[in-house]
Amino acid sequence: MTHYHFVGIKGSGMSSLAQIMHDLGHEVQGSDIENYVFTEVALRNKGIKILPFDANNIKEDMVVIQGNAFASSHEEKARAHQMKLDVVSYNDFLGQIIDQYTSVAVTGAHGKTSTTGLLSHVMNGDKKTSFLIGDGTGMGLPESDYFAFEACEYRRHFLSYKPDYAIMTNIDFDHPDYFKDINDVFDAFQEMAHNVKKGIIAWGDDEHLRKIEADVPIYYYGFKDSDDIYAQNIQITDKGTAFDVYVDGEFYDHFLSPQYGDHTVLNALAVIAISYLEKLDVTNIKEALETFGGVKRRFNETTIANQVIVDDYAHHPREISATIETARKKYPHKEVVAVFQPHTFSRTQAFLNEFAESLSKADRVFLCEIFGSIRENTGALTIQDLIDKIEGASLINEDSINVLEQFDNAVVLFKGAGDIQKLQNAYLDKLGMKNAF
């Protein structure tokens, strides 16, 4: 048994990894800011100690796992180096862990967390699968056959991994504080493709993914019969989305997903492709797909009277469009109200027009002040720059939250990667309901 200390344990990946090591029988603790972060719930439920930052947290027998958000001068990292302890980055440590399993990396600008959550749930319907999901959820199952994990492209972190398979959901320009342009993003994914050992499953309609070259087979999925695996006869029902799957032009089986939206069918196709390639039992896979309950902060719903309140992590224009599409397909007779908190000044600046276009697909838009990050907490623009580009949009905060009560037959989408849950919970308090998020 090893004693691990995680510097920045409330980070979504760090929280998941800490839970995995705890489940595998190791002693685990960590430190972070004292402000509430939703990822800490799972840590506390497993009895994992969360401490405030302090150099005295570092003890002689520890292996220190360092989060990517903190500089090498951080007091705990500095103490660990002074004591000549093993200090391993999150990426390098995860790379070591996955080598013990048949591993499946899920990467892409959008859809990573939802697809990883679905993959882990469905594969566990047939084979033991440990998993690390970017919503702060992780589980280490002793004697697992597989390891499903989310692999982020930011700062090329995913180049630390050499997975057996990689699901590539899409390539898009994001993280403008690091990537120069879409070509820079493509180069990162191209380099990652050469790390994959058995096969790549990629979305067939992505023009950039179609240009990827690899040393292993690439299987494309989508809605066209030119794809290697594709869905047809898609039907929206009161139970979810039903569809037929074809592999290499031959009918494979009929599936039902309890979710809505084209992107959820695409996620399911990627997972079904992995299951097919690994020859998992299709009956077990179908049953597991039908029971998938979603992941944290991805279209999580709470219903109060005729109003559906949704918590979602969407923080990029394409993700915002996807959540609005899901709301319209699932609740076609309700208004869609978007409450959005932009995440980072650089992203807001880079996608200002795209944010305005995607948010305008809602019936009404409310915007919160821009949420900064540890690396970037100021910028040249303000939230008013985005408000001015969306007809009828207005600013909202905890003091004005009761304005949402007027939309009594609506889906209210709270979206963002910052602390928008404070606003959600303030609204739930106004309605006399215990916090659901």
From Swiss-Prot:
Gene: murC
Pathways involved: Cell wall biogenesis; peptidoglycan biosynthesis
GO CC aspect terms: cytoplasm
The protein's name: UDP-N-acetylmuramate--L-alanine ligase
Pfam families assigned: Mur_ligase, Mur_ligase_C, Mur_ligase_M
Amino acids binding ATP: 108-114
Gene Ontology molecular function, alphabetical: ATP binding; UDP-N-acetylmuramate-L-alanine ligase activity
Main location: cytoplasm
Transmembrane segments: none
Class of the enzyme per the UniProt entry, highest EC level: ligase
Record field: catalytic activity: UDP-N-acetyl-alpha-D-muramate + L-alanine + ATP = UDP-N-acetyl-alpha-D-muramoyl-L-alanine + ADP + phosphate + H(+)
EC number: 6.3.2.8
Function, as annotated: Cell wall formation.
One GO term of the biological process aspect: peptidoglycan biosynthetic process
Organism name: Staphylococcus aureus
Location of this chain's protein in the cell: Cytoplasm
Keywords, comma-separated and alphabetical: ATP-binding, Cell cycle, Cell division, Cell shape, Cell wall biogenesis/degradation, Cytoplasm, Ligase, Nucleotide-binding, Peptidoglycan synthesis
Family note: Belongs to the MurCDEF family.
Record-linked InterPro entries: Mur-like_cat_sf, Mur_ligase_C, Mur_ligase_C_dom_sf, Mur_ligase_cen, Mur_ligase_N, MurCDEF_pg_biosynth, UDP-N-AcMur_Ala_ligase_MurC
